[in-house]
Structures are given as structure tokens and as C-alpha cells.
Design a protein with these regions (language model features):
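Outer membrane beta-barrel transmembrane domains
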Residues: 64, 70-74, 226-335
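Outer-membrane beta-barrel biogenesis signature
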Residues: 13-73, 77, 173-175, 335
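Repeated loop/turn-to-beta-strand initiation elements of outer-membrane beta-barrel proteins
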Residues: 105-107, 157-161, 210-213, 262-265, ...
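Residues that define the transmembrane beta-barrel architecture of outer-membrane proteins
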Residues: 89-93, 131, 135-145, 159, ...
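Transmembrane beta-strands of outer-membrane beta-barrel pores
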Residues: 55-61, 111-117, 153, 167-173, ...
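Extracellular loop and loop/strand-boundary signature of outer-membrane beta-barrel proteins
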Residues: 37-38, 79-83, 130-137, 185-190, ...
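Hydrophobic alpha-helical segments and helix pairs
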Residues: 140-196
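Residues on the lipid-exposed face of transmembrane beta-strands in outer-membrane beta-barrel proteins
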Residues: 39, 51, 55, 95-101, ...
């Protein structure tokens, strides 16, 4: 969405100029053009710094039935049957800085602050009298800090290709560092994934007046690590395990439309495949391959030559995807 906002003014300007100027013959792009750092591009211009403040609201809900105990016979259940309805809300406040080293090379750093709250409504259906309970779990802290490099491969001939490399740290609270109760439920919610990751990506941008077509392909490689898992709830014994969190393959595509030099909007589809995780080199029997699909819509308005307001909404299309996400971004160019 940030690239579409950056291109919207350029696309609108090209549309106006095309009505007044005669088409010029195209010149073949050379290797010198590909390596020239002073040509204008679609990333942050050389020497410019952009401060991007963002806020996102994510809502998700799920229903599940679990058995606390074990079965002796197929028709005989020993233990409790718990039916739960969980509403998850996540608020994220992010501060991102982008600096143009050259017109085609950009560096980025992002610091998020995460607040999470889960409302869990449970009913024990197999007890003598069904008991309804409502439990709320919260968690707030700094999230996983990220850093990224972006490089525009070609400058003159569309489509424009941009390569990226993103690094994610483990500054947020890990799921393996927060306390759990006797039923292995979180008593405090984590704010990070607990594992560092590296994400290479490739983005294509194709201006077609008055629209811009874009596509992105990326792969998130989660680096495996040794963690301590509480295997007994009574005497606090721990067991060290090597966990390899499932990697993620992401693909997204869409179109942006420039209404005028100040306003543009976009619509797109996103797909993520999260591979199965491994514990001590083997895949657990209950591990799942997750498919996340979502539909997004965004609007960009140029408040001033240095400030832009970006609003985006995303709706989940599959069971594993978040139900709804609303994001607001305000990039401000300092130089």
C-alpha cells in the first residue's frame, strides 16, 4: 500500500502530461541504467527520511470443543468436555523510519508496541450442572523489532522490480516465556513470536494509466531455537526442546487507481501458506498446514506534499485468517 501511495501522484501526473506531449521513442535500457544510483525511482529518494506512524486493530474469533481427561471406551468419556468461544483483539502502534541511501536503495526499521486481549467464554458440558465462565487474559509490551533493505532493480522501463530483505528480532515476549496455568492456558499473552526470522521478497509494480498493478512474493524463514517447555504443572520441571516454527509463503496482488493527484484507492488479494512446525526434528501428529486468504481495500490521501493519510481494511476469507483488520498510517517526509 505504501508503494501505491508513492506512485499515485506520479501516475496522475503522467496522465495529465500525456494529453499535452507527443509520445517519444523508447530508448533501450542498458546495464549502466540498471546500476546508476542517481536515477529517480519509486522508493524513498536519496537523502530523504520518512517517519511513518501506524495503528492497527485486529479482531478474530474462534469456537472449539476440548476434552480435559481421556477416553476409556469410544462411548465412555472420563474427564470434562469444555466448549469455548474466544474473541481475540490486538492493537498495534508502530513507528517506522525509512531512509533513502540512494534513489534505488532504501533502509527501514520498525518498532511496534502490542496490546492483546482475549475474552474466553467456556462451558463445561459434561459436569452435573453446566457451568459458564468468562475469563479475560491481557498482554502488552514491545513487539518484535524489524529491519529491512529494499532495492529497485530497474529504473526506466516498467514493470518496476523491487527486491527486499527483512529481518525480525525477538524483542517481544515469547509464548514460551509467559506463565501458563494447569490447563496450559496463557495467564499473560505474548507480544512476539519467540523466534527470529529472515524474509526475502520480490515486488512488481506496473503503471497503466490511470491504474497501477502490483504483485508481491515473499518467504519467511523462521530460525529454529531451543526453548524450555513446562512438562509438569506441579513440581515445575522443564524440558528443553528444539522448535522449528513453520515457515510462511506469501503472495499478494492487486490494483491501485489514481482518482486525482491527491487521492487514490487500491484493492487486493493476499494468500499465505504456513507450513507445519517441527519439534526436535519431527512433525507432531496434530500439526496443521494453515491457509490464510484475505481481501484488502485501501485509500490514500495526500494531506500535503510531505504528509499522506493511508487507511486500509482487510477481511479474512478462510477460517485461519483474522476476521477483520483496520489500519491507519501517516507517513511524513522530514527531508
Amino acid at each position: 500500500m505504501a508503494l501505491l501511495a508513492l506512485l499515485s501522484g506520479t501516475v496522475a501526473a503522467e496522465t495529465t502530461d500525456s494529453n499535452q506531449e507527443q509520445p517519444k521513442p523508447k530508448r533501450v535500457q542498458t546495464w549502466g541504467d540498471l546500476l546508476d544510483p542517481d536515477l529517480p525511482g519509486v522508493l524513498t529518494p536519496k537523502g530523504s527520511f520518512v517517519l511513518d506512524t501506524s495503528f492497527s486493530y485486529t479482531q478474530n474469533s474462534s469456537n472449539s470443543v476440548s476434552i480435559v481427561g481421556y477416553t476409556v471406551l469410544p462411548s465412555l468419556i472420563v474427564g470434562l468436555i469444555r466448549a469455548s468461544d474466544i474473541d481475540r483483539t490486538t492493537l498495534t502502534l508502530g513507528l517506522t523510519g525509512r531512509y533513502g541511501i540512494t534513489n534505488r536503495l532504501e533502509v527501514e526499521a520498525r518498532i511496534p508496541w502490542v496490546y492483546r486481549t482475549d475474552s474466553i467464554f467456556e462451558r463445561e458440558a459434561s459436569s452435573g450442572t453446566p457451568t459458564d465462565t468468562l475469563r479475560t487474559v491481557n498482554g502488552s509490551d514491545i513487539g518484535d523489532i524489524e529491519a529491512a533493505f529494499k532495492y529497485q532493480i530497474n529504473m526506466k522501463e516498467a514493470p518496476y522490480w523491487i527486491g527486499s530483505l527483512r529481518f525480525k528480532s525477538t524483542t517481544g515476549k515469547s509464548p514460551y516465556d509467559v506463565p501458563v496455568n494447569d490447563l496450559n492456558d496463557f495467564e499473560e499473552l505474548p507480544t512476539g513470536s519467540g523466534f527470529p526470522s529472515i524474509e526475502p521478497g520480490l515486488t512488481m509494480i506496473m503503471p497503466i494509466d490511470p491504474a497501477v498493478i502490483y504483485a508481491n512474493l515473499s518467504y519467511i524463514w523462521n530460525i529454529k531455537d531451543d526453548v524450555e517447555v513446562d512438562v509438569t504443572s506441579g513440581d515445575q520441571e522443564f524440558q528443553a526442546s528444539t522448535i522449528d516454527l513453520g515457515d510462511t509463503i506469501s503472495f499478494s496482488a492487486g490494483m491501485g487507481f489514481s482518482v486525482n493527484p491527491k487521492f487514490s484507492f487500491s484493492i487486493g488479494l493476499s494468500h499465505k501458506t504456513i507450513l507445519k512446525s517441527k519439534i526436535d526434528g519431527s512433525t507432531p501428529s496434530d500439526a496443521k498446514l494453515l491457509q490464510l486468504d484475505s481481501l484488502s481495500f485501501g485509500a490514500n490521501y495526500a494531506i500535503s506534499p510531505k504528509t499522506t493519510l493511508n487507511i486500509g481494511a482487510t477481511a479474512g476469507l478462510t477460517a485461519d485468517a483474522p476476521d477483520f483488520q483496520l489500519s491507519v498510517r501517516i507517513p511524513y517526509t522530514l527531508k
